[in-house]
């Protein structure tokens, strides 16, 4: 119905924003990964959208990339996963990282994401394994940051008091391909202090 919006960002309060398109203000809910990348109020934005309508409500969701929207749609096809968990996934890990977790069958790393327990993670693996290339644009995840390292570092950061989504983001953003867990944790903590 509404596939994309381009307009001026007029309001920005996590996780909501309003985009003015030719005098009409569209309210969208966005994952935190998208929210953090948005420009300041008053600047133009270009968002891919997903529209949902239930019995008594309608909602519009916004994403910076087509691959984020594609993953959001794939996640909602998994039994027991709705928009809330789909947004939590996109707020916690990148599309490439998520595809790598699915391809690797890493249940433990998936359970770090808020709202995903062991059973939900296992169901995601079963239902999404064959579709990982679809939402990942067929990009191979080899050569990327070691996913076991990311999940271990995220768990350690949680033990230090960080929320699961924040810990996952910190670990993912801080590490490089050759880093061990201790190095990822150290870099994540240094980045948090800056």
From Swiss-Prot:
Protein name as it appears in the record: Holliday junction branch migration complex subunit RuvA
Pfam families with a match to the protein in the record: HHH_5 (PF14520), RuvA_C (PF07499), RuvA_N (PF01330)
InterPro entries referenced in this protein's UniProt entry, alphabetically: DNA_helicase_Holl-junc_RuvA_I, Hlx-hairpin-Hlx_DNA-bd_motif, NA-bd_OB-fold, RuvA, RuvA_2-like, RuvA_C, RuvA_C_sf
Encoding gene, per UniProt annotation: ruvA
Source organism of the structure: Xylella fastidiosa (strain M12)
Record-level GO cellular component terms: cytoplasm; Holliday junction helicase complex; Holliday junction resolvase complex
Subunit-level organization: Homotetramer. Forms an RuvA(8)-RuvB(12)-Holliday junction (HJ) complex. HJ DNA is sandwiched between 2 RuvA tetramers; dsDNA enters through RuvA and exits via RuvB. An RuvB hexamer assembles on each DNA strand where it exits the tetramer. Each RuvB hexamer is contacted by two RuvA subunits (via domain III) on 2 adjacent RuvB subunits; this complex drives branch migration. In the full resolvosome a probable DNA-RuvA(4)-RuvB(12)-RuvC(2) complex forms which resolves the HJ.
UniProtKB keywords: Cytoplasm, DNA damage, DNA recombination, DNA repair, DNA-binding
Protein task: The RuvA-RuvB-RuvC complex processes Holliday junction (HJ) DNA during genetic recombination and DNA repair, while the RuvA-RuvB complex plays an important role in the rescue of blocked DNA replication forks via replication fork reversal (RFR). RuvA specifically binds to HJ cruciform DNA, conferring on it an open structure. The RuvB hexamer acts as an ATP-dependent pump, pulling dsDNA into and through the RuvAB complex. HJ branch migration allows RuvC to scan DNA until it finds its consensus sequence, where it cleaves and resolves the cruciform DNA.
Entry keyword Thylakoid: no
A molecular function GO annotation: four-way junction helicase activity
Gene3D superfamilies referenced in this protein's UniProt entry, alphabetically: 5' to 3' exonuclease, C-terminal subdomain (1.10.150.20), DNA helicase RuvA subunit, C-terminal domain (1.10.8.10), Nucleic acid-binding proteins (2.40.50.140)
Compartments reported by the entry: Cytoplasm
Location of the region described as Domain II in the Swiss-Prot/TrEMBL record: 65-140
Domain notes: Has three domains with a flexible linker between the domains II and III and assumes an 'L' shape. Domain III is highly mobile and contacts RuvB.
Region Domain I, residue ranges: 1-64
GO terms for biological process, alphabetical: DNA recombination; DNA repair
């Amino acid at each position: 119905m509404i596939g994309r919006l381009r307009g001026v960002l007029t309001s920005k309060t996590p996780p909501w924003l309003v985009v003015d398109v030719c005098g009409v203000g569209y309210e969208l809910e966005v994952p935190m990964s998208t929210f953090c990348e948005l420009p300041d109020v008053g600047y133009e934005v270009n968002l891919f959208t997903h529209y949902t309508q239930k019995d008594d409500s309608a909602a519009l969701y916004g994403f910076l990339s087509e691959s984020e929207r594609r993953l959001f749609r794939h996640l909602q096809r998994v039994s027991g996963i709705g928009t809330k968990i789909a947004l939590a996934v996109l707020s916690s890990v990148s599309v490439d990282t998520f595809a790598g977790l699915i391809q690797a069958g890493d249940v433990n790393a998936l359970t770090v994401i808020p709202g995903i327990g062991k059973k939900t993670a296992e169901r995601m693996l079963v239902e999404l394994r064959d579709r990982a290339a679809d939402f990942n644009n067929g990009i191979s995840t080899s050569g990327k940051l070691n996913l076991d390292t990311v999940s271990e570092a995220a768990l350690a950061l949680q033990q230090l008091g960080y929320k699961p989504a924040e810990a996952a983001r910190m670990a993912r953003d801080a590490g490089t391909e050759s880093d061990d867990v201790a190095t990822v944790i150290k870099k994540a903590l240094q980045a948090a202090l800056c």
